[in-house]
Regions:
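Class I SAM-dependent methyltransferase SAM-binding "motif I" and its flanking Rossmann-like core
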Residues: 104-165
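Structural signal for conserved beta-strand scaffold positions within catalytic alpha/beta enzyme cores
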Residues: 34, 59-64, 125, 145, ...
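Solvent-exposed alpha-helices and their adjacent loops that cap or buttress functional pockets
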Residues: 1-2, 24-25, 89, 97, ...
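A contiguous loop/helix-start segment that scaffolds small-molecule binding in enzyme catalytic cores
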Residues: 5, 163-220
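A polyampholytic, Gly/Pro-enriched intrinsically disordered region
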Residues: 78-86, 142-154, 212-220
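Class I S-adenosyl-L-methionine
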Residues: 1-15, 20-121, 211-213
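Short, surface-exposed amphipathic charged segments that create phosphate/polyanion-binding patches used
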Residues: 73-82, 138-141, 164-168, 206-212
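Short gly/pro/ser/thr-enriched loop/turn and capping motifs at secondary-structure boundaries
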Residues: 39-41, 68, 130-133, 200-202
Length: 220
């Protein structure tokens, strides 16, 4: 009998924010997969290790993806990663693929799941607390009130027009483009808050655009 693939959201950073279902799923999977060269480079693995015992006893697959927008390169990588996971599924082993935040929000996992399911294997998404929800809680404010609109925007693409939308905006994937993001925010006179490494020991809170750094490391 083939194993099953789980895309497990480990939340934004604090292990205590992981859901009970996420913890139980990881405990019951003999194989852990991370989107990095190895577990020592995966923030998601570090988070899960903070609450799931005996993580080091599990087999770990380091399945990194290139930081590029080239779809051909990415699709080739997704296929390769999926094949590595399928090998374990064919051995009858369940695999937990760990993602930061929630697997349904800008996660590599979803592309892998589509390939795995297309090949006839079972897969399931285990939700996690999205980073922007944790950030709003940390700042002590809501993301949207009453009739306010809320927009999630990928900052590694052009954000100028998106920032003109009504309502509040969540800017994600800004790490390597932070200097460009700051420039646009200043040009449009936008107010913004930012939390780096929310819920982690290295957490930093920035209360204005001027306080924000020019770049932060890309999370894995």
């Amino acid at each position: 009998m083939s194993g099953k693939l789980y895309g497990v959201g480990v939340g934004p950073g604090d292990p205590k924010l992981m859901t009970y279902l996420a913890v139980e799923t990881i405990k019951n999977c003999p194989v852990i997969a991370v989107p990095a060269d190895g577990k020592e480079h995966a923030i998601s693995y570090k988070i899960a290790s903070g609450i799931v015992k005996d993580m080091d006893q599990k087999e770990c697959l380091g399945l990194s993806s290139p930081m590029t927008k080239d779809r051909k390169i990415l699709e080739k990588n997704y296929q390769k990663v999926s094949e590595e996971i399928i090998k374990k599924l064919d051995e009858g082993k369940n695999v937990a693929y760990l993602t930061l935040g929630d697997p349904t929000v800008y996660s590599t996992y979803i592309y892998i799941q589509r390939i795995v399911k297309k090949c006839g294997y079972d897969a399931e998404i285990i939700n996690g607390v999205p980073s922007f929800c944790a950030v709003a809680a940390k700042l002590g404010d809501s993301l949207a009130d009453r009739s306010e609109q809320l927009h999630i925007i990928p900052s590694n693409y052009d954000i100028k027009e998106a920032l003109k939308l009504p309502g509040n905006k969540i800017l994600m994937k800004a790490a390597s483009k932070l200097s460009d993001v700051k420039k646009v925010l200043k040009e449009q006179g936008q107010k913004a808050w930012m939390i780096e490494n929310c819920g982690m020991e290295e957490e930093k809170i920035y209360h204005s655009v001027d306080e924000m750094p020019e770049r932060t490391p890309d999370p894995r």
